[in-house]
Amino acid sequence: MDGMKKVPVREQEPKVRATNFEEVCYGYNEEDAVAEASRCLNCKNARCVQGCPVKIDIPAFVKEVKEGNYAEAAKVIGKSSALPAVCGRVCPQESQCEGQCVRGIKGEAVSIGKLERFVADWSRENGVVPEKPEKTNGIKVAVIGSGPSGLTCAGDLAKLGYEVTIFEALHEPGGVLTYGIPEFRLPKQGVVQPEIENVKKLGVDIETNVIIGKSVTVDELMDEEGYKAV
């Protein structure tokens, strides 16, 4: 294998994809994921981490993939990201983590996003779920909106022990993940819903059909329902 080039990712053939709305990209299988992870140089001062908005320890999780320790890779990613299956598919890696990859200077960057997706999909298929914090601090926090930023915020707060409730105006949670990105790019039942369920497993409650300012006000949340922050 040419170490300067990415391992090709499997996709639907154009003639096939033109007949359905299923996900176009199949992602890596285990063999391809290990091969791609083996291209990582494990840089001491990893530029890819600086390019990641949530600062995932990319060399650490890629190393675990290389060694076949997918559950451990999931734990590394889970420390920083609540939505790895989503981010592995729709984040603009080419201008973020992969855009900073040293491999990309004289060749092709490591396919960090595809590896993140592989780990997330493997975790879902093998029943690996995020660990709920053993204790909460008793402090209630409300998050307005269940789009990617709201879900991420809620997940991070839950990991720190806060009692978090997300209030969503629409019928289904997910925001742009549910209502904006097409199925062939981001499957709803197979990817988005399981990711939302994983956030719930951290202890986050989600209330839909709640319009802040109409159904309930911020003052009511804080003065009457005991929320300490919104």
Put a short name on every predicted segment:
Residues 2-26, 55-67, 75-78, 105-113, ...:
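Beta1-alpha1 glycine-rich phosphate/pyrophosphate-binding loop at the start
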Residues 211-230:
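Conserved beta-strand-loop-beta-strand element in the redox core of flavoprotein oxidoreductases
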Residues 82, 119, 175, 216-217:
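Short secondary-structure boundary/hinge segments and terminal tails
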Residues 33, 144, 167, 227-230:
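Short hydrophobic core segments
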Residues 1-140, 227:
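Ferredoxin-type iron-sulfur electron-transfer modules and their immediate structural context
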Residues 127-131, 192, 216-219:
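A generic local structural motif
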